[in-house]
C-alpha cells in the first residue's frame, strides 16, 4: 500500500508511519529472521493500521492477517507454537478454553475451505491435532483434579474418625490409670490387714501354747496323787521300834506326807511365774 492509497481514503498519516509502511511493504523477507520478530512485525503492522481506526475492517485487514499467517507458516517451529489471533494469546481455563477451541475450530474450518495450499492444509491439520491434544490433556487434568478432591474429602473423613478414636483412647487411658492407682491402694491396704492378721494369729498361738504349758506344770499327775492317797489310807502310822531317847518327838505317819506335796506344787508355780512373768 502506497501514499496515494491513504490519500484516496482521505486519512492523514505522519512521515514516520509512511516510512515504516514503505519499509515493511518493500523490504525482502530474511529467511534467518526469527519467528518472534516476524510475529511482532505483524502485530506492529496491525496496531499501526487499526489502533486508532484509520481503516475500517474489510478485505485489507484480511490481507494483512493472511500475510502474517504465511510468515508464521514458513517457520519450521510454527507447528509447535500455540495459535495467536489478533496478537492475543488465549490462556484462559475451563469453559473459556472450550469456547475458544470451538471458535478456533470454526475459523480453521473456514480457512481450510477457502485455501487450497498444501502447506496451509498441513498447518491447519497440525493445529487441529494440537488442539485436540490440548483438549484431552485438559480433560485428563480435570479428571485428575476431581479424583484428588475426592481423595481429599475421604482423607478428611478418615482424619476426623481417627481423631475421635484418639480422643476416646485418651479418655480410656486416663480412666485406666485412675483405676490402677485405686487398685494399688487397695492392695496396700490388704497387705497391711494380712500382716496384722498374721501378728494376731502368732500372738494367739503363743498364748495358747503358754496356757497349755501352764496347765501342764500346774496340774500334778493323777497317778501320783492316787498313790499318795492310797499310801495314806493303808499305812496310817509307822512306829519305829528304837530308842526314842535318840530321836525325841519324831513320829512317822501317813498324814504328814500331804503338806510336803503342797510345798512342791507351790514351788513349781513360783518357777513358772519367774519364767513367764
UniProtKB/Swiss-Prot annotation:
Species this chain originates from: Arabidopsis thaliana (Mouse-ear cress)
Family of this protein: Belongs to the bZIP family.
InterPro entries tied to this protein: bZIP, bZIP_plant_GBF1, bZIP_sf
Lineage start: Eukaryota, Viridiplantae, Streptophyta, Embryophyta, Tracheophyta
Location of the motif Nuclear localization signal: 124-131
Entry-linked PANTHER family: BASIC LEUCINE ZIPPER 63, BASIC LEUCINE ZIPPER 9
Annotated segments matching region Leucine-zipper: 148-162
Chain intervals with Polar residues compositional bias: 109-118
Residue positions, PTM Phosphoserine: 100
Superkingdom of origin organism: Eukaryota
PTM per Swiss-Prot/TrEMBL: Phosphorylated.
Tissue specificity: Expressed in roots, shoots, stems, young leaves, and flowers, mostly in vascular tissues (e.g. phloem).
Induction: Repressed by glucose.
Name used for this protein in its record: Basic leucine zipper 9
Residue ranges, annotated region (Disordered): 73-141
PROSITE patterns for the chain: BZIP, BZIP_BASIC
GO molecular function (one): protein homodimerization activity
Cell compartment(s), UniProt: Nucleus
Protein role: Transcription factor.
